[in-house]
Swiss-Prot record:
The gene is Sox14. Residues 52-71 have a biased composition (Pro residues). SUPFAM superfamilies: HMG-box. Keywords: DNA-binding, Nucleus, Transcription, Transcription regulation. This is Putative transcription factor SOX-14. Residues 187-255 bind DNA. Residues 1-12, 75-84, 295-318, 419-431 have a biased composition (Polar residues). Residues 1-149, 254-336, 419-439 are annotated as: Disordered. It holds the Pfam family HMG_box. GO terms for cellular component: nucleus. Residues 17-37, 88-105, 284-294 have a biased composition (Low complexity). It comes from Drosophila melanogaster. It is found in: Nucleus.
């Protein structure tokens, strides 16, 4: 149906859609004008009959309201409704801001159609989008689908989230920002103007440069925001204020409480997780018409974890989470523990020193506590060192190595220490395994005159004890097993001095007492049994004792108890076969000491065995302290040994005050 221009009947004018601007030609009003309307709905099919538009009767004022449109066909009504309602924001929120933050050059006016009587649709329409694309790409920044509101030649693509909030919504701020759910009890602060602007701009940057890192995007956004003028920032400031009010409605009791930043190490800093504007790029082909999957302001809502892309526009943790979800277990653990096999751990293995230190290792510094051999337990080594000087003991290893066959009596089959079976089990790869066999091949030295002076010093303490089980080398100290402590041994009379600290007897080293173990039958079961050899190091101990003899002058019986220095002889050194009492000269008093009592020498049966004698009838005087007094006409200095006076807990300085002895002068040696 074609309307003629000179039609006499008056038809009602066309009702315009809000936001459109009618274009009136600058010709005479009598001629009809063709109106071009920009539409977003699909173009009609080719076989459909084009509907006619009645001519527009201009009024003197262009802003006059047109009259209502007459009734049309159902197809025409559907087309008009699609053209009138293009976005829910235009209806739901009449106060939707028309922002002009980014003014663009006005589009070139579309060419008007010729002066024909028929109205044809514009040929500049975009291809009709699909329903899923219409629902999923309502954000204003999607290319090719911008919703334009033409008003006075200014185009704008800004539609904020506050315009999409339903009137009766209980969560208006969450609906406006489409924020994701956080941990329970955590409420995010309302977005400021920069966050509103950067959320929309980030989406555009990610579309142009999808490989750009988040940190670089943030720097670029900050630089651009500083370059914007106040007028350009005004729409975002208004939107931020609206979001703040919506935030107050949703969270009425919210109060911002900033928390102190925790000090973190550089390696523990989490990557930036602000990737809301870089997502949902791969969701455009999803045929989901639900409103919960709408992308508003460049963000996505439901199902975002399963639809993350691996673009670097997103946070660095997204790709890491995807790698973890893929089941990749090829990563190395944080700590690697190196475990040794059971064959490498053997508690019975002992690493022996080299060949030059083997003798010194066994006889000078260390003592074998339990040295076990084969099943017969036939040979043992009892290395009980004597109490000789320390400086002579350092050369013991070399001496024993040179003259060992002399002490063994020339028996080539004897061995020192552990038997060959135990040596082969404990030290199979040691090059010193055959050292003992080579020592036995040395010819014995039977003539003692050929021995050096150094060897002769050790002969009194060495004993060759031949037995049926074999030869045993014993290095014993005098009376080691008889008494817990030894008698002092003086070298000569010249070495006796008054100061006990300077005497060699005060510098004696206590003998090493080995922890001897017997070989029982269960410990020596078979040839294949190997036992762990234990060694013990006994540190030398030095006991220092100062003895001061105070001899006061005068007294009641000073007439017959006055002695001179020439009346005394030097106290000789006690030999091994002499009495244990060092007071053995003719002019010295024959007084012995037993416990805390003085006894006469005639009552002493054996001076070396005080504990086995009975001195009940011979006790001169008994004292329990250190001030000892003895009634004796032949009084002299009482020399007490280390055994006679054990160390007292009060100290090592012992003072003996013999008030009963009267001397003409102090006696000093």
């Amino acid at each position: 149906m074609i309307a003629k221009p000179n039609q006499a009947t008056t038809e009602p004018p066309l009702s315009l859609r809000p936001g459109t601007v009618p274009t009136v030609p600058a010709t005479t009003p009598a001629r009809p004008a063709t109106i071009t309307i920009q539409r977003r709905h699909p173009a009609p099919k080719a076989d459909s009959t084009p509907h006619t538009l009645p001519p527009f009767s201009p009024s003197p004022s262009p802003a006059s309201s047109p009259s209502p449109a007459p009734a049309q066909t159902p197809g025409a009504q559907k087309t008009q409704s699609q053209a009138a309602i293009t976005h829910p924001a235009a209806v739901a929120s009449p106060s939707a801001p028309v922002a002009a933050a980014a003014p663009k050059t006005p589009k070139t006016p579309e060419p008007r159609s010729t002066h024909t009587h028929t109205h044809t649709h514009s040929q500049h329409f975009s291809p009709p989008p699909r329903e899923s694309e219409m629902d999923g790409e309502r954000s204003p920044s999607h290319s090719g689908h911008e919703m334009t509101l033409s008003m006075d030649g200014i185009d704008s693509s800004l539609v904020f989230g506050s315009a999409r909030v339903p009137v009766n919504s209980s969560t208006p701020y969450s609906d406006a920002t489409r924020t994701k759910k956080h941990s329970p009890g955590h409420i995010k602060r309302p977005m400021n103007a920069f966050m509103v602007w950067s959320q929309m701009e980030r989406r555009k940057i990610c579309e142009r440069t999808p490989d750009l890192h988040n940190a670089e995007i943030s720097k670029e956004l900050g630089r651009r925001w500083q370059l914007l003028s106040k007028d350009d920032k005004q729409p975002y400031i208004i939107e931020a204020e609206k979001l703040r009010k919506l935030h107050m409605i949703e969270y009425p009791n919210y109060k911002y409480r900033p928390q102190k930043k925790q000090t973190r190490s550089p390696g523990s800093l989490k990557p930036n997780q602000d990737a809301d504007g870089c997502e949902a790029r791969n969701d455009t082909t999803n045929n989901n018409n639900s409103l919960t999957t709408l992308a508003i302001n460049g963000t996505t809502t439901a199902g975002r974890k399963s639809k993350r892309s691996t673009s670097t526009c997103q946070s660095g943790s997204a790709s890491k989470r995807l790698r973890n979800d893929s089941g990749d277990t090829s990563s190395k653990p944080k700590y690697e523990v190196k475990m040794e096999s059971a064959e490498q751990l053997n508690s019975a293995d002992i690493i022996l020193p080299s060949a030059d230190n083997l003798i010194s290792y066994q006889s000078s510094e260390y003592l074998p506590l339990s040295t076990l051999s084969n099943a017969d337990c036939d040979e043992k080594l009892h290395s009980e060192l004597s109490s000789g000087p320390l400086e002579s003991r350092e050369n013991l290893s070399e001496v024993v190595n040179r003259f060992l066959p002399l002490f063994l009596g020339g028996n080539e089959d004897s061995q020192l220490g552990v038997s060959s079976l135990t040596q082969s089990q404990h030290n199979q790869s040691d090059p010193t395994a055959g050292l003992m066999d080579n020592i036995s091949d040395i010819s014995p030295i039977n003539d003692r005159e050929e021995l050096t002076e150094e060897v002769m010093r050790y002969l009194p303490y060495l004993e060759v004890n031949p037995s049926s089980d074999g030869l045993t080398l014993k290095v014993e100290s005098s009376s080691l097993l008889g008494k817990p402590l030894n008698e002092p041994v003086f070298d000569s009379e010249d070495n006796i001095v008054n100061d006990a600290n300077l005497h060699s007897a005060s510098h004696q080293i206590p003998p090493y007492v080995p922890d001897s173990h017997d070989c029982f039958a269960e410990d020596c079961g078979g040839d294949s049994s190997s036992h762990q050899v234990e060694f013990e190091v006994v540190r030398p101990q030095t006991v220092t004792m100062t003895m001061t003899c105070t001899l006061p002058y005068g007294g009641p019986d000073a007439g017959h108890t006055t002695f001179q220095a020439d009346d005394f002889n030097a106290i000789p050194s006690a030999a091994e076969d002499s009495e244990c009492s060092i007071l053995t000269t003719s002019n010295s008093p024959q007084i012995g000491f037993n416990g805390s009592s003085f006894v006469e020498a005639d009552a002493i049966g054996s001076t070396c065995t005080y504990a086995q004698q009975d001195y009940t009838g011979s006790v001169i005087e008994t004292h329990n302290d250190l001030n000892y007094a003895a009634h004796d006409n032949n009084g002299a200095l009482l020399a007490y040994t280390f055994e006679d006076l054990p160390p007292q807990p009060t100290g090592s300085h012992l003072e003996f005050n013999t008030n009963k002895y009267e001397f003409a002068s102090y006696y000093k040696m």
